[in-house]
């Protein structure tokens, strides 16, 4: 057999002729001859029609980034309808490789390859390329412009989970072609949609990853896309509309009842679980009324335009608040037996991300004849994925109605709610998850429900051996936040940032690579202050002294 035939045989299996095991990559290695023009579809663990590679591009060192080789690829869909789109992916191969790799998750509804030279919310120190990581990610199988992909089951499943495996497997082939061996340690880092993707790979592909950082994961993705419509459906009767004028009254009532629950009246609701229990009408004694002090006498609002914290709320407005701050029960259990969507946690941003809106929409009482249909970031998941008609009115959804079977199917594809992480734990995998309770873009209620489901399934002791479920109270989708400038006693106080900074990457790397188990309580800093970072369901309880010092708090239940 001549050399050309030998090289052709090895290329078909994913390896190129002449490659050697090495940690260094030179510009002369960043070529199609070395890295190839395609990858066999058999090397990809989920179905693809073909994998093609673009010509590699060498990026010279430019501070703070070292030199690296960038290669793009495209995975053709199996579906032939034309609605399914190719997955576009990219792999960055550093000149000095540390035998580590990291897959970076997306954001929003995806649609673009993430910036692989950065890792938001992962480290406060040197970046991944600077540390010698090979990094990789994809657009998940659709672009930002066209929407017909939302009518393709393959594209929806790509978004939900398949693109993660496909991109991983393609990246592993290219890393081996570049350096020889596979990575000693492979990680996944993501925030928001990327956080959900981090949970997804632990649940679906546990053998592929050693460590995961997942920030503010949109755990119950299918329900999160539907939830804004559920609120607008609740508000179909004009009497149920919670107007923007009532935001200060709602915020003030949350603060009045919950600020003091952590031992300190400071404009921060640290004891989030106790606050949830107060305003979740499905908990506690039947018929109790956490909003009694805000009800308009005789159910008549004397001044609907009153924007003060003293404004009253009508029975209809309170019924909507009860819906938003209590779990939403499904007509039929969804994937993994999930029976409810946790909705939102009482906080200082009751109108955030469209929880409260100023107008009326098509299908609601009092809407103008030419009123627009309600639209939001994830509405394509309702009209496209669920109703399979992008022109449909999302407010036509009925729980348990004609779309119920499709709802269950989408949940299987999109939701990252499997509580059984035993395979990930058994292979030595570690994860750090961080959420904020003032997050109106994701659902803190659903995140907390997921944490509890994992603990219920696996046991607290086992979970603590491989996972940390950290909660930073009163922080938003970016894990930042401020104290409210009116505390629970109604006093005006100075605004100050809530401490939120901690360096996740070295903690996770030490846990994975050196078996150094992190404590269950860390410290977050910011604005000249510090607070304990507590593992769910604990919270920072004030025990006395200078309130800006983490040492004067304990993590308590």
Question: What are the functions of these language-model segments?
Answer:
Residues 433-435:
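Short beta-strand/loop motif that positions the catalytic acidic residue
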Residues 441-445:
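Conserved alpha/beta-hydrolase "acid-adjacent" motif
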Residues 19-100, 113-115, 122, 265-269, ...:
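Catalytic-loop region of hydrolases
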Residues 107-180, 226-227, 391-413, 475-494:
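Cap/lid segment of the alpha/beta-hydrolase catalytic domain
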Residues 181-192:
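Alpha/beta-hydrolase fold nucleophile elbow
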Residues 195-206:
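Short glycine-enriched nucleophile-adjacent loop
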Residues 204-207, 211-248, 271-273, 352, ...:
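Hydrolase active-site cap/lid region
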Residues 76-165, 192, 203, 231-237, ...:
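N-terminal cap/lid subdomain of alpha/beta-hydrolase-fold enzymes
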């Amino acid at each position: 057999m001549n050399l050309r035939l030998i090289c052709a045989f090895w290329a078909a299996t994913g390896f190129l002729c002449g490659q050697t095991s090495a940690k260094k990559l030179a510009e002369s290695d960043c070529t199609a001859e070395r890295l190839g023009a395609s990858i066999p579809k058999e090397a990809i663990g989920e179905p693809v029609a073909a994998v093609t590679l673009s010509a590699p591009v060498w990026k010279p060192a430019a501070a703070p980034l070292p030199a690296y080789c960038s290669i793009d690829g495209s995975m053709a869909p199996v579906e032939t309808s034309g609605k399914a789109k190719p997955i576009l992916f990219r792999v960055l191969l550093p000149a000095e490789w540390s035998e580590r790799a990291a897959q970076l998750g997306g954001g929003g509804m995806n649609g673009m390859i993430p910036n692989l030279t950065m890792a938001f919310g992962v480290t406060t120190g040197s970046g991944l390329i600077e540390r010698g990581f090979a990094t990789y990610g994809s657009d998940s199988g659709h672009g930002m412009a066209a929407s017909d992909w939302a009518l393709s089951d393959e594209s929806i499943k790509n978004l939900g989970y398949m693109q993660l495996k496909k991109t991983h497997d393609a990246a592993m082939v290219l890393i081996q072609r570049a350096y020889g061996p596979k990575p000693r340690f492979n990680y996944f880092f993501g925030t928001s949609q990327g956080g959900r993707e981090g949970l997804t790979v632990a649940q679906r592909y546990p053998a592929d990853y050693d460590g995961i950082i997942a920030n503010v994961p949109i755990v119950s993705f299918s329900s999160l896309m539907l939830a804004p419509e559920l609120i607008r459906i609740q508000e179909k009767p004009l009497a149920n509309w919670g107007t923007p004028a009532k935001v200060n009254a709602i915020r003030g009532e949350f603060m009045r009842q919950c600020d003091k629950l952590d031992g300190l009246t400071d404009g921060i609701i640290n004891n989030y679980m106790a606050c949830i229990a107060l305003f979740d009408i499905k908990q506690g004694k039947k018929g109790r009324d956490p909003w009694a002090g805000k009800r308009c006498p005789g159910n008549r609002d004397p001044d609907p335009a009153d924007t003060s914290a003293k404004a009253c709320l009508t029975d209809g407005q309170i019924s909507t608040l009860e819906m938003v701050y209590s779990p939403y029960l499904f007509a039929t259990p969804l994937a993994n037996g999930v029976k409810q969507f946790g909705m939102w946690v009482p906080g200082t941003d009751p109108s955030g991300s469209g929880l409260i809106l100023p107008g009326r929409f098509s299908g609601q009482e009092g809407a103008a004849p030419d009123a627009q249909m309600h639209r939001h970031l994830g509405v394509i998941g309702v009209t496209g994925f669920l109703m399979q008609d992008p022109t449909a009115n999302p407010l036509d959804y009925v729980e348990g109605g004609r779309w119920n079977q499709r709802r269950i199917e989408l949940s299987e594809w999109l939701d990252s709610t499997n509580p059984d992480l035993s395979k990930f734990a058994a292979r030595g995998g570690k994860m750090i998850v961080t959420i904020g309770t003032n997050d109106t873009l994701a659902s803190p209620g659903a995140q907390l429900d997921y944490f509890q489901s994992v603990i219920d399934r696996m046991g607290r002791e086992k979970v603590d051996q491989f996972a940390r479920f950290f909660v930073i109270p009163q922080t938003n989708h970016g894990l930042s936040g401020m104290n409210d400038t009116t505390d629970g006693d109604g006093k005006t106080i100075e605004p100050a940032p809530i401490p939120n900074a901690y360096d996740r990457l070295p903690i996770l790397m030490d846990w994975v690579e050196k078996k150094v188990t992190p404590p269950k309580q860390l410290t977050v800093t910011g604005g000249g202050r510090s607070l304990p970072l507590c593992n769910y369901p604990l919270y920072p309880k004030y025990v006395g002294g200078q309130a800006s010092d983490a040492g004067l708090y304990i993590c308590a239940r």
